[in-house]
Amino acid sequence: MLFQAKELKEAGCNEIDMVLNIGKLKSGMLNDIEDEIREIKAAVSPLPLKVIMEVVLLTDEEIKTASSIILKAGADYIKTGTGWAGATTLHHIDLIKETVGDAIKLKVAGGVRTLDTLLEMYQMGVSRFGIGYKSALSIMEECINRETHE
């Protein structure tokens, strides 16, 4: 993963995403995870590093542990998922924010399909959203409809 991150930086990428090693998290190899994130962050600096944790595959305690590790290792963002494993819920965001507060930025991917969901997550402190094309169109239509009916 370190080699790929360096290659992506050299290729001109503006930011880097990496997926947290869930197997190591579930096996309790927490120092290994922190070291890996720290090494990649050092290699791609000053580019922003987003660490994806796939919250739908983790227990509440694992989400809290992963959030702490990501923050401690110096990443710029916690990203809740790739968008493929399932929907991020308000409960997932609560767990992350309860653990790290506003000390690190949060990006949600997966499950943002309505304007109300987006607004609620934004009010909870989510700074970025990964939204699929169809959902983005639907959310924009909701915005337009609300604006024209108010």
Annotate each PLM feature.
Residues M1-A43, P48, V55-I63:
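Active-site beta->alpha loop and helix N-cap motifs at the rims of alpha/beta catalytic domains
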Residues M1-E7, L58-I69, I93-E98, D102, ...:
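Catalytic cores of alpha/beta
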Residues E10-L25, K72-T89, G110-T114, Y122-R146:
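Glycine-rich phosphate-binding active-site loops on the catalytic face of alpha/beta enzymes
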Residues L25-D32, I37, E61-T65, I69-I70, ...:
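Generic alpha-helix signal with a bias toward terminal, lower-confidence helices
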Residues G28-V55, K72-A73, A87-T114, R146-E150:
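Alpha-helix-loop-beta-strand connector modules within alpha/beta enzyme cores
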